[in-house]
Amino acid sequence: MPNIVDRFGQLVDDAIPKPELARQLLLLGYRAKDVQLLLAPEKELTPARQYAAQIAMDAMIAPLAHPQRAALVNIFMPCELLHAFHLLPMFAEATACYLNGAAAERGFIHYAESAGISPTLCSYHKALLGMGLSGTAGKPLFTACTSIACDANNLTFRRLAQHYGIPHFYLDVPYDHDEYAVAEVSDRLREFAAFLEDATHQKLDEAALQQAVAHSGRTLELLQQAQAAKAGRNLHNDVTSEFYEVFVTHTMLGTPQAEQYARKLLADIEASPMGGGTRLLWAHAVPFYQAPVRERLNFSAENQLITCDMNADTLGCYMDPDKPFESMAARLVNNIFNGSAQHRIQRALELCRMQQIDGVVYFCQWGCKQTMGAAQLFKSCLLYTSPSPRDAHES
C-alpha cells in the first residue's frame, strides 16, 4: 500500500499538465516539511546537521515560491554575486533530490524525455528540465552556468533559457590551474556582474559583494578546520546530511547561514568521541534516497560516512573581500572538478590520509560521463597508493 509520501508524489505527477497546481503542491509539501524540521527535528542528528536540514529546505523553497527573483544555475556557479543582488539560486542536484524525496521525480523525468531530452542525460538535469519545460518551476529571471563539471550544463541551461525566453550566461573555465586562467575567469565574472545589473535593473552593491565574499572566506576556513578535526572521531553521521552540506559548500557560500552552519559543524565534530568502525570517503553525489545506503550508513558505528568529496572540492581556498572577483575566480579555477581527474584523485588521497579513511565508495551516478570515465583511474590510484585507503569500491 502506498504511503503518504508516495501518494503526494502521485498527486504532483498528476498535476504536471497544470504546472501552477503542481508548483503549489510542491510548495505545500516542502513547507510542511520545513515546519517539521523546525518544530520536531530528527533527534539523532547533531545541532549542526539539524540546522543544515532547515537552511537547505529554506533554500529550496525560496526560488520555487519567488521565481521572479530566481536564477537557475549549476552547482559550481559562484553565487556571491547573486546574494549581493538578493537573488535566489536554484540548482539541478537540489531540485532532483528534493523531487525524489517527495516521490515526484518520475513524472518530471518522463516529461523531459517526452520533450526530446535523451534518456542518457544526467538524471539530475533531466529532473530540472522536466520542471522547467513543464512550467512547474515558474519563469526565472535568467539562467547561468559554468563549464564545470559536465557537458550537460550547456544543454540544460541554454535549453531552459530558450524555452522561457530569458537571458543565459555561460562561464567557460579553462582547464589549467594557473594565474592566467584566474585572470580570464575574473574578467568573465565582472561581465557576469554587468549581466546581473541588466537583468535586475540595479547597480551592484560592491560593499554587499565584499561582505558575501568575507562570509565565504570564513565559512571555508571553518569547514577546513572541521575536515581536519574528523580524524579518528566517531561522527554519528547520516547520508542525507552530506547532501545538505552541498548547499553550504556551493550555492549558499556567501551567506551568514552557511557560515553559521560551518561554525556549528566544527563544534559538533570537536565534541565527538574518538573511535569508530570502518571509515568511508564517498566520491560524487550521495544517493541518500536509496534505502540500502541509508540502512548501512545512517548513524552506524560499523560503517561511518566521514566525508563526501563534493564537500571538500575547494579546501584551502583563500577568499579576499578586497579582491572579490579574483577570489571567486581562483576558487572556481582551482576546484578539483575542473580539468584533469588527477585533481580529484589527489584531493581524495589527501582526505584519506587526513581523516584515516579505510575505504572509498566511488558512485557512478547515471548519466555523469565525467565521473564514470574516471572510475578506473580513480580506483587504480587509490588501490596502489600507500598507506590508505585499504579498499575501494565502485557502485
Indicate where each model-derived feature is located:
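Conserved small/polar residues in nucleotide/adenosyl-binding loops
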Residues: Y384-P389
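A charged, amphipathic alpha-helical module
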Residues: P2-R69, S186, R190, A194-Y318
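Structural motif
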Residues: V73-F76, C145-A149, W282-P287, C364-W366
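A short, acidic, amphipathic alpha-helical segment used as a generic capping/interface helix at domain edges
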Residues: M131-G132, G339-Q355, G373-L377
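Acidic/His-rich segments in extracytoplasmic proteins that coordinate ligands and/or metal ions
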Residues: K126-F195
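Redox- and metal-dependent alpha/beta enzyme cores, enriched for Fe-S-associated oxidoreductases
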Residues: L81-H110, H284-A348
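An N-terminal, globular interaction/scaffold subdomain
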Residues: A52-A53, M57-M60, A70-P119, L129-L133
